[in-house]
Amino acid sequence: MTPFTPSPLSRRQWLKSSGLVAGGAMATGSLTPSLLPALESDAVHVIDGQTTAAGFAAHEQMVAAARRADGPIRLASNENPYGMAPSARKAIEDGWKQHAWYGAPSLPNLKKVYADSVGVPVDHIMIVAGSSELLSIVCLAYGMKGDVLTAWPTYEGLPRYAESLGIRVHKVPLAADLTHDLDTMDRRLTQAVDLTFVCNPNNPTANVTDNAKLRSFVSNASRRSMVLVDEAYHDFVTDPSYSSLVDMVKKGENVIISRTGSKIHGLAGLRTAFVIARPDIIARLQPLSTSAPGVFGALGAAASLQDTAFQAMCKQRNVEGREIMKTAIAKMGRKMTDSQTNFVFFHAGMPVEQVQKAMLAKGFMIGRAFPPYTDWARISIGTPDEMRAVAAALPEIIGGAPKSLGSSER
């Protein structure tokens, strides 16, 4: 197998060499549907809304070439390296004329498709323009009269927004195994706390918190505050002991589940996210929402949700890339978490900024520092070939770095 190496080839050069520029037309910005290769025909690659194995293979080759052409490989923001499903692209192309219309006529269908996919009534679903808005409106609805409780470090969107509003945020350090310290969080759950935030699997640590303990904590917390559970990485989990907390919503508890179209569905640029909650909670959140996904986000998300074959193939490729990284990190004798996401988190033994700089020189962008774990690295999972190249580069960069952990990182 030919080793993977990031290419200095520019996007413009790649478009020319790939024969994607015709009649003097030249692409600018990101690849648009009209410039993507036909991949033979939709009849071959998407059958009954499902991406075929042959279609995924062709799609994978095309996307890998485009990623190399774009410059440094993006392994910093936990994006899906395969982008949107061919079925989603087809849905957007078929609905292209809707781009001139206000609103998104396809939103009601998306709501129904999503409700069916998670097994709740339609009135338990709200669609918003990305997770950032979702977290903001939950904070406005349930965090303004008291404090916010969260583990730390975790996904920063909600805590950061709360602090910008002058809300007091109680940040509970992670446990020794870098999971949520639920015992301490429970002790900090005073009458002053109005909103409790849990990210599971957690970002940046990539791991899941014990299912039984988390359920017990959330059930208790929901009797004292609203609980927001961010399940952005739910679709990547392979740990059989893990389960979503959607069933707690079905039981009528004070729990809001946050999901996104940005990860396994590859729709980060189309800003689509999902709220799962009781109807009365949805009714309180809805007036605070200032926007909704555009027509293309709604069309693409609905098609992708139904394309379970594409999701399964993305998940399998993610497992392959994740195992490549876990093996490489273990061989270097580095401490790491048990990743259940599309990224890994491990002890590099040197400031992350140095690792970033060295990896960028080799053609890879990786994640930033997450205090207090400033010598731990977060690297998103790309294609298996990309991860083999990363695994080969890491020993040269961090091989001689200290393996012992600082007192704040034990």
Predicted regions and their residues:
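PLP-dependent enzyme catalytic core of the Aspartate aminotransferase-like
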Residues: 361-362, 370-410
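C-terminal segment of N-terminal export signals and the immediately downstream linker at the start
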Residues: 31-77, 83-94, 405-410
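Active-site pre-lysine segment of PLP-dependent enzymes
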Residues: 182-191, 207-227, 231-264
